[in-house]
Amino acid sequence: LDDHDDRLAAHAREIGLEVGLQHGGGLGERMNAALRDGLQEAARVLLVGSDCPVLDQTYLALAVDGLDNARVVLGASEDGGYVLIGGSDASVWHDRRFEGVRLGTDYAMADTLVALNDVAPVTVLPPLWDVDIPEDVTRARNLGVLP
């Protein structure tokens, strides 16, 4: 989270999750810090985007299972990005891990895989779609996943 939200934190605790504040400069630095810091407390960490209305419990379970045999899991998106990233090894997440990765673009997945070229194995999950442009909102409404 960018700011502390007492209601969200309370709900997360009710279902056995922990919510933390983000720190770092850009998105890559914040993601890196969240993965590295989270792995100091837990064996596996998933960062999940908030713009994928079709991401469900089954997909999250695939991501967790993907970390059984990999140090990193990526949930692909149809547009070349990803809807989640996870890890099981804190040593992967050094300060320059996302350097050169064009996050938020159609190149995010490809760039991230290049940035992870020294990490093996990496699990890549089947692509989902996320909401980035007005047509995606229409798609979500037509599928009944957004009002």
What positions do the PLM features span?
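Conserved catalytic core of nucleotide-sugar-dependent glycosyltransferases
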Residues: 78-95
